[in-house]
Regions:
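Histidine/acidic-residue-rich, glycine-tolerant segments that coordinate divalent metal ions
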Residues: 9-14, 29-37, 41-42, 48, ...
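Active-site beta-strand-loop-beta-strand hairpin of nuclease catalytic cores
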Residues: 19-23
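A non-catalytic alpha/beta surface segment that caps or lines the substrate-entry region
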Residues: 1-17
Length: 155
């Protein structure tokens, strides 16, 4: 664990040898007269905990995990400096955990939201006027293929 990517207070620790790289952002800040505020103590702790939890699973999962210390988050643009200096270069995805004003009995996670999607078509005679039809099944298949391809590229 050493300062890295142009920031003296940044660090990175990588687990695993082969496979797609998953970056866990360990966000922190030291604000004058406040210290670690805006949930950065929770963000850093959760990201480190997730990384340590994955440490013994990286070979089994076929991934690499990088814990990336991202300082200067309140106005300093720490992640921007890290991005400009290549810290996220090989990442297939990067994640972080952030506290918010949600009830733990009914949490909201944007990554697992459910959506109801309806496809509407328009009937047409295949021989008489096929150009007047709208095939809803084509749109549905396209959504499935694109969502599946996107998921495959994540890891």
């Amino acid at each position: 664990m050493y300062p890295t990517h142009g920031l003296d207070t940044a660090f990175e620790v990588t687990f695993g040898k082969d496979g797609p790289l998953v970056v866990l952002c360990v966000e922190y800040d030291a604000l004058p007269e406040i210290g670690h505020a805006c949930g950065h103590n929770i963000i850093a702790t959760c990201s480190i905990g997730a990384g340590l939890g994955l440490r013994n699973l990286v070979d089994q999962l076929g991934i690499r995990v990088k814990l990336l210390g991202t300082p200067a988050e309140e106005g300093g643009g720490g992640k921007i400096i890290l991005l400009d200096n290549g810290a996220f270069e090989d990442a297939k995805c990067s994640m972080m955990i952030h506290p918010g004003p949600y009830d733990v009995a009914n949490p909201t996670f944007s990554t697992i939201q459910q959506y109801k999607v309806e496809f509407f078509g328009k009937d047409a005679h295949a021989a008489g006027a096929p150009e007047e039809g709208i095939n809803a099944l084509d749109a549905q298949i396209q959504l499935f293929v694109n969502a599946s391809t996107y998921r495959q590229q994540m890891l």
